């Protein structure tokens, strides 16, 4: 069943499908990020301990979440690529890795900015921070490995294997605050019965998270479509566009 489903995802079909989704994804991202940042920066009250410094949460938390979400996409696409050797998923793997690296860097950068007034330093070798930094290195290694081969298919296969092995870091990042004594607090949002964050602060975070997620989807599809055009430039269907 899965094989027949994936085999129908041809480069040509993916190109036209992504072309329809990309504008909507970016439109949703602009609306939700804009509204979320407006609420977070101008409407939400100051934190009683951190003051206005906490407001960076509306960029930091979505970035950290998407750094893991993007790697999950890399992992799934890598498995599909290795089993069924479908070009579209090879391209989706590297596109997800590129954008995942971007959000990982953004999470680390905003975390450093947030950490300076809170912890008194830009960086500590905290378990969560260290494992997130390792994630950035894994992303970069996947990208470099992919482009180190003249043959796209060989590069994709090598990158897929590394991506699957590197997935072990994802649960380490997620559970690091429970397994080790870290400066990072435990979950404060993903406790749906009683979130420990005030609703006035929570809703803007939900909006920006949805917005950044929509941006990630659009960016992955756009990057994939551009790579697809390069790889398929000598095919008839590209000439007919």
What are these regions (language model features)?
Residues 1-241:
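Polytopic transmembrane helical bundles with strong interfacial aromatic enrichment
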């Amino acid at each position: 069943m899965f094989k027949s489903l994936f085999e129908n995802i041809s480069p040509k079909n993916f190109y036209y499908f992504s072309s329809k989704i990309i504008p909507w994804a970016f439109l949703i991202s602009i609306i939700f990020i804009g509204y979320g940042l407006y609420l977070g920066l101008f409407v939400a009250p100051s934190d009683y301990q951190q003051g206005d410094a906490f407001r960076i949460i509306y960029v930091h938390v979505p970035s950290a979440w998407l750094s893991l979400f993007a790697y999950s996409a890399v992992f799934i696409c890598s498995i599909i690529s290795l089993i069924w050797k479908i070009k579209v998923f090879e391209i989706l793997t590297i596109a997800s890795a590129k954008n995942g690296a971007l959000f990982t860097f953004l999470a680390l950068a905003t975390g450093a900015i947030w950490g300076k007034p809170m912890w008194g330093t830009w960086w500590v070798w905290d378990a969560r921070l260290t494992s997130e930094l390792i994630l950035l290195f894994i992303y970069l290694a996947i990208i470099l490995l992919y482009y180190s081969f003249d043959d796209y298919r060989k590069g994709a296969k090598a990158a897929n294997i590394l991506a699957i092995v590197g997935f072990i870091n994802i649960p380490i990042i997620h559970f690091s605050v429970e397994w080790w004594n870290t400066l990072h607090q435990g979950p404060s949002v993903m406790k749906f019965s009683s979130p420990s964050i005030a609703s006035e602060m929570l809703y803007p975070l939900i909006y920006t998270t949805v917005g950044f997620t929509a941006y990630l989807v659009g960016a992955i599809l756009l990057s994939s479509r551009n790579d697809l055009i390069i790889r398929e430039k000598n095919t008839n269907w590209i000439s007919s566009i």
